[in-house]
Amino acid sequence: MDHRLLEIVACPVCNGKFYYNKERQELICKSDALAYPLCDGIPVLLESEARAIKLDETNS
């Protein structure tokens, strides 16, 4: 995952910042508690593809 991409992309729901979870290959939006998957290194920024996460998962 190119960390420069994190400076450009924003959460499609709240326009907030993402945090990269390398272990799960996901972009995490702490504001909405949503995790967006990466497919071959490309973020899938569709709300319908995001999974809800628990608050303790946002610390990853």
Swiss-Prot record:
Coiled coil: none annotated. Transmembrane segments: none annotated. GO terms for cellular component: cytosol. InterPro entries: Trm112-like. It comes from the Bacteria. Belongs to the UPF0434 family. This is UPF0434 protein SG0997. It comes from Sodalis glossinidius (strain morsitans).
